[in-house]
Amino acid sequence: AGDCSTYDKKSIWSIPVGSNKMNIIKTEIPEVVIIEPIVRGDSRGYFMESFLKEKFEREVKSTIFVQENESISSYGVLRGLHYQLSPFSQSKLIRVVTGKIMDVAVDIRKGSPTFGKWVATILSGENKRQLFVPRGFAHGFSVLENDTVVQYKTDNYYAPEFEAAIRWNDPALSIDWGLPVSDIKLSEKDKYHPMLADARLFDYNENLYG
């Protein structure tokens, strides 16, 4: 059965000014991490550091991002659950520039103590949070507002021949996408992915960063 750890948004203006430039928030799946930049605003607008390599490598994961992608989507669009197989497996660091999504990471490492469990968190242009999804996980998101712009970094290049995916509504996962099912809009491709039980997966003991 699936499992969920959901973290709701926090207003960027409620974050206290301190010496740290971003907060690292652990989820119930230890490898999946929420990153919350410290935002400083006044009447002119705001400023934040959206990525700090040294802090990220020290507190999250030592990896090198090589590609950044951007999409814009309307309300109800659902993309996922996507991943790439070895040797082109990818970590992702996802953020929302404008709008709001429910962002989901699913552990698909056979033998993992959290295999088949998932984390869901709201990322928005307001809360400025980011989600780190490591290799060995499937990723997807549902769009909760029109004209939502999503950016994400990856630590491996896009390799279409190594693409894989799991059905968004697999009952073994029972993911809550935060939308009425009748509002969900899918690509033709995303409608017909295999269920978790039939998908190509990772092994927990495999060194995906080797």
List each language-model region with its residue ranges.
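Non-catalytic, conserved peripheral segments adjacent to functional cores
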Residues: 21-126, 146-147, 154-210
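Conserved metal-binding segment of the jelly-roll/cupin
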Residues: 123-146
